[in-house]
């Protein structure tokens, strides 16, 4: 009888360890990484900013996609809940985290599409008169199994 109880306890313990091992396996895989830029465009300048997005930012993003540097990009309009919050989000999706390390390649593509780095920096200063970059965050898609 004691042998049966001990054997039953050993069997139960081994089943628990199998269940614990199964929980060690990730139930997701890591997907694309998206850079989310929060922008606040001053009142009265929204169309001006959209014109810049269409004339410069969009062709640059298309060139990045053609070069294989990004896999997607989007623009979102938000309704701010309070002052100091963004009203535009620029969304750039990379295949993985390694895609974020391609700054030199992105700069070369941007020079071909827009102009030199110095020229781009001067244009940024001009845009900063009517828009403010509130911050950037990176989010990663988790693909559930």
Task: Name each model feature, range by range.
Residues 45-72:
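Short amphipathic alpha-helical segments
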Residues 25-28, 63-71, 91-140:
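An amphipathic, aromatic/His-enriched active-site/gating alpha helix that lines ligand/cofactor pockets
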Residues 29-44:
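Acidic/histidine-rich, surface-exposed loop or edge segments in extracytoplasmic proteins
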Residues 79-92:
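Charged, often glycine-rich, active-site loop that binds/positions anionic groups
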Residues 1-9:
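Bacterial N-terminal signal peptides that target proteins for export
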Residues 50, 85-87, 101-105:
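Short, solvent-exposed loop/turn and secondary-structure capping segments
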Residues 22-27, 77-79:
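Short beta-strand/turn micro-motifs at beta-sheet edges
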Residues 16-22:
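Sec/Tat signal peptide C-region and signal peptidase I cleavage site
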């Amino acid at each position: 009888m004691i042998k049966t109880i001990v054997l039953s306890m050993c069997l139960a313990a081994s089943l628990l360890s199998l269940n614990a091992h199964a929980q060690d396996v990730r139930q997701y895989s890591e997907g694309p990484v998206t850079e989310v830029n929060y922008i606040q465009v001053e009142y009265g300048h929204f169309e001006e900013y959209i014109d810049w997005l269409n004339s410069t930012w969009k062709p640059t993003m298309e060139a990045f996609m053609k070069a294989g540097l990004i896999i997607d990009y989007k623009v979102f309009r938000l309704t701010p809940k309070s002052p100091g919050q963004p009203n535009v989000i620029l969304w750039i999706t990379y295949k993985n985290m390694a895609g974020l390390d391609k700054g030199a390649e992105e700069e070369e593509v941007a020079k071909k599409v827009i102009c030199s780095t110095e020229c781009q920096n001067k244009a940024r200063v001009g845009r900063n008169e009517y828009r403010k970059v509130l911050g950037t965050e990176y989010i990663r898609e988790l693909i559930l199994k």
